[in-house]
Amino acid sequence: MKHLRKIIYSLLFIAGFASCVTDDIGDCSTAETANAQVMLSLSVPSARLPEATRAIGNDETINSLHLLAFENGTLAEITDITSKYQNASEGKFYVAVKESTGQVGLALVANTDVSALSTGMAKDAALQSLIFTAANLTYMPMYGETQEFDGISRNRTYDVKVNLLRSLAKVEVQYNSTQSKSEFEFLEIEVLNTRAQGYVAGQGIPATSPIVGSIKVPPTVNSSEPNRQEIASAYVAETVNDASNKISVLIRGKYYGAEGYYRLDMIKAEQTDEIDRLTRNYKYVFALQNVNYAGRTRQAALSGEADNQAFNSVVMTLSADESDILDITTDDRFFLGVNSATMQLADNGRICFAKLKILTNNYSEGWKIVDAPAGVTFSPGTTGGKATSDADRKVSSVWIYIDTGVVTSDFDFYVTSGKIRKTITVRLP
C-alpha cells in the first residue's frame, strides 16, 4: 500500500509539472500572476498599388508588432508579439495578458520604436511618447486598440478584432492622359509645407514638429502611350492647412519641351473650400487629364493663382477602404474612379471573370455600366453608387463574367456617372 501511495504521489507531481510546462499562457505560481487567453484578429490595411515612391515600399508590411496592455489608464505590460503575428494564420493568434479586476484596454503598435515606453506611464503620456519622423521611413507606423474590458480573467475567453490604421496621410497626383510624352512629360511633384513628425497613435499634432518645406517625388509609370497613367505620391504626417501654413502640390513638367511648374491647392469642391487638414490613414488625390498649356517658373507658380481651375482638378479625399481606387476621371464637380481601367480576366475555362471596383462622389445619381457586348454579365448588377450623403458613399464591387464561347476577343464597355463616361477595357486570358 505504501508503495502504491508513492506511485500515486509521483504521478500527481508529474501531471502538475506537465500542466505548467505545456500551458504557454498560464502561470502555475499564484493567482496574482495568472494570465488570461486573448485571441487577436488583426486587420491590416490592404496594400494599395501603386506604392508611394517616397521611402515606404509597402504600406501593409509589419516588421515589428508590440502589444500594450493598459490597466485603469496606466501602462501595465509591453510585449513584443512580432513572431506570433508572423507565424499566425490569417492574422489570428493568441496572446497572454495578466489577469486583472480593473479596466483593461489593449493596443497594438506596428513598425514603431517603443523604447520610450515604460510600465507605470499614464496612457496619454505613453501614446504621446510614440512619435515618428516622416522622412525615410521604411515601414508604415500603424496603431489600433480594443474596447476596454471590465476586468480580464483566465476563466473567460476573449476574441478581439483590432483594426490597424496607418499613422500617415498620402498625397497623390494621378496623370491619366492620351497625350504623347513629347507633348507633355510629367517629371515630378513637390508636396509643400507638411509636418516632419507625427504621433503614431493619433494624439493630434506634436507642437514641436517642424514644417518640411518641400518633398519631391518622381512619378511611377503604370502604362505608356496611347493611354498613359503616371502616379506620384508621398506619405506625410498629419498637418493643418490654413493661412499660416498653406499646403500645396507643385507639378514639374515639360510642355512641348519647355519645363515649367503648375500649382494645385487643396481645393475640395467647386473651386471654393480647401481641405483644412491632412488626416492619417486618408489619401488625397488630384486627377489630371491632358495638360494643354505651358507651366510657369517655380516662383511664379508659388506666388500666382493656383492651376486647379485650369486643370479642372480638385482634391479628392479617399478613406482607407476607398484608396485602392486608382484610376479617376473628373468633371467640373464630381469624380468617377475604378480600381483599373484595364481588366485582365482570370482563366476559368469557358466562364472567365474579373473584379471591378467603382466609386463616385455623385451619390445622388450613382453610376451605370453601359454598352457591354452579349456574353457579358455583371454581378450584382449594372447600377449602383447611390447614397444619402457623401459620408455614406461606398466602393462598389462588381464581378464581370464572360462566356468565352460568345466573346472571343478583347472588348470595351463604359461606366458613366453624370457627365463622366469612363472606358473599361477587358482583356481575355
Where are these regions (language model features)?
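Tryptophan-paired
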Residues: 50-121, 172-280, 340-358, 401-404, ...
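Extracellular/luminal low-complexity segments enriched in Ser/Thr/Pro
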Residues: 385-412
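C-terminal edge beta-strand
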Residues: 264-266, 419-429
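Surface-exposed binding patches on compact interaction domains or structured appendages
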Residues: 338-340, 351-395
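Bacterial N-terminal signal peptides that target proteins for export
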Residues: 1-8
